[in-house]
Amino acid sequence: MQFADFVTCGFNQIVNNLAKTHYRWGQNADVVVRMPTGAGTGAGPFHSQSNEAWFFHVP
């Protein structure tokens, strides 16, 4: 993913599909989503979101 800001575009699939795979089919869905996040990426004020809290509260 280019910037963490864009994770919101795929958040429905990540939360509603991947997070519930274990409960629906009894299988793990091991996924790594890599994206630059927070300050220090040199991307300006519009690409410096920190969305980690969303993922910490998803099963």
What is the predicted role of each segment?
Residues 1-59:
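Conserved thiamine diphosphate
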